[in-house]
């Protein structure tokens, strides 16, 4: 399963659980390069999920089974952890966990 397929599955699970979802879509520029027109530091996680019913916030970095995080992504994830913010690197093997996490937020404390 590639990252795009994984993203679609995780977003569908989040929607079923009533989460608000933010994802920046990359766009191809005139030179044929992929670019996301957002200002900020590189490596920002792929998804930001917010449960309006439980007041829970989760940042998600999506990776294929063999995908590796970059040093910029690791910096973001480490910084989120230092701030006490829930974050996960989600791979296809993590679908059971993320499904449970997003469909049963009542079982997780803030």
Language model: regions and residue ranges:
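Catalytic phosphate/metal-binding cores of nucleic-acid and nucleotide-processing enzymes, i.e., regions
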Residues: 1-110
